[in-house]
Amino acid sequence: MKIIVASSNKGKIKEIKKFFEGIEILPYSELIEPFEIEENGTTFKDNAIIKAKTIYEKLPGSIVLADDSGISVPVLGGVPGIYSARFAGAGASDKDNLYKLIDELKKRNIKKTYAYYTAAIALATPYGIFTTHGFMHGNVIDEARGNKGFGYDPMFIPKGFDKTLGELDENIKKSISHRSKALELANILLKSINN
């Protein structure tokens, strides 16, 4: 089996490859010229479906996996939410987005507050489109700690831990992450449709 990932995000692709060991995982950009996919949905699920469908239309008959994920901070009105990848503006780096969120907390004198990650996975297959979700709850802090992971990991402390995802061992992160939970369900779906 081969899975085409509808992303160019190296961090996401690396995480997906680790999860689906023994299955060929290819970013779509290795098969077709990369292009910008307009994510104009109002939820993580909407955007994951848009990405999966868009790549599937270019590579019909394949299995396309798309992820849309982000972090939501309720005390800030749920931001960055679906705008997590572009919170600091179009073309912003992970680091830019991270420090923008830290600045938003500091502006309000918030040292630590509840937040959660959401991951929506869409699978576009010859049998239709399937979706799964995963969540990870915890707190964000007003500083970056650790250099593991990517995105907002250095400021997010998962529930039950005292270290940020940027400080935790990658195997621990893999076992508790929102994306891992959604990918686990996606893996079950894939096995059921491939039998």
Swiss-Prot record:
Residues annotated as catalytic: 68
Keywords from the UniProt entry: Hydrolase, Magnesium, Metal-binding, Nucleotide metabolism, Nucleotide-binding
CDD domains, per database record: HAM1
Binding site for Mg(2+): 38, 68
Enzyme class: hydrolase
Alphabetical list of InterPro entries matching this protein: dITP/XTP_pyrophosphatase, ITPase-like_fam, RdgB/HAM1
Keyword Hydrolase applies: yes
Cofactor: Mg(2+)
Any one cellular-component term (Gene Ontology): cytosol
Catalytic activity: XTP + H2O = XMP + diphosphate + H(+); dITP + H2O = dIMP + diphosphate + H(+); ITP + H2O = IMP + diphosphate + H(+)
Origin: domain of life: Bacteria
Function: Pyrophosphatase that catalyzes the hydrolysis of nucleoside triphosphates to their monophosphate derivatives, with a high preference for the non-canonical purine nucleotides XTP (xanthosine triphosphate), dITP (deoxyinosine triphosphate) and ITP. Seems to function as a house-cleaning enzyme that removes non-canonical purine nucleotides from the nucleotide pool, thus preventing their incorporation into DNA/RNA and avoiding chromosomal lesions.
PANTHER family found in the cross-reference section: INOSINE TRIPHOSPHATE PYROPHOSPHATASE, INOSINE TRIPHOSPHATE PYROPHOSPHATASE/HAM1 PROTEIN
Family: Belongs to the HAM1 NTPase family.
Subunit structure, interactors included: Homodimer.
Protein name (record): dITP/XTP pyrophosphatase
